[in-house]
Amino acid sequence: MFHATTIVAVKKGEQVAMAGDGQVTMGQATVMKHKARKVRRLFHGKVLAGFAGSVADAFTLFEKFENKLEEYQGNLQRAAVELAKDWRMDKALRNLEALLIVADKQSMLLISGSGEVIEPDDGIAAIGSGGNYALAAARALVKNTDLQPAQLVQEAMEVASSICVYTNDQIIVEEL
């Protein structure tokens, strides 16, 4: 499990939103930064990507993923599969410790270093130390409210930040 991060994403129809907290923790006990940006727009603003794990590793993966998006003309699924293949096969990449959630208006995917590319059945994904709390909150909110994706991820992150010590309430939301 990756500490110091929570990312949650919700897709409803062609609307998608992703949120991440801002906390960066060094080791197990020291908060080094409160307002880190862990959710980004890629490929001319058409793709959202969020990471959990080592910051340096995540920047490497963002760059590799954006290169794959360019190579495959924005085809999210193809770019994700190719990144996962490289991540699994390349000796240097294999040592990177991170998870990614990527989304565009058509799909949302979770990408892991073990080569997994998973599309959630319900259009909801969460990763990181507070991921399970955010996932549970998002699912409950989707089922019981009419909130839009941006509001859903904001609320889910607030729940996670109130429970997980590695997740703060400095939440950044991006939406398509």
Curated annotation (Swiss-Prot):
Na(+) binds at residues 161, 164, 167. It catalyses: ATP-dependent cleavage of peptide bonds with broad specificity. It is an enzyme of class 3 (hydrolase). Keywords: Allosteric enzyme, Cytoplasm, Hydrolase, Metal-binding, Protease, Sodium, Threonine protease. The active site is at residue 5. GO terms for biological process: proteolysis involved in protein catabolic process. InterPro entries: ATP-dep_Prtase_HsIV_su, Ntn_hydrolases_N, Proteasome_sua/b, Proteasome_suB-type. GO terms for cellular component: HslUV protease complex; proteasome core complex. Its EC number is 3.4.25.2. Allosterically activated by HslU binding. It is found in: Cytoplasm. GO terms for molecular function: metal ion binding; threonine-type endopeptidase activity. Pfam families: Proteasome (PF00227). PANTHER family: ATP-DEPENDENT PROTEASE SUBUNIT HSLV (PTHR32194:SF0), METALLOPROTEASE TLDD (PTHR32194). A double ring-shaped homohexamer of HslV is capped on each side by a ring-shaped HslU homohexamer. The assembly of the HslU/HslV complex is dependent on binding of ATP. Protease subunit of a proteasome-like degradation complex believed to be a general protein degrading machinery. Belongs to the peptidase T1B family. HslV subfamily. This is ATP-dependent protease subunit HslV. It comes from Desulfitobacterium hafniense (strain Y51). The gene is hslV.
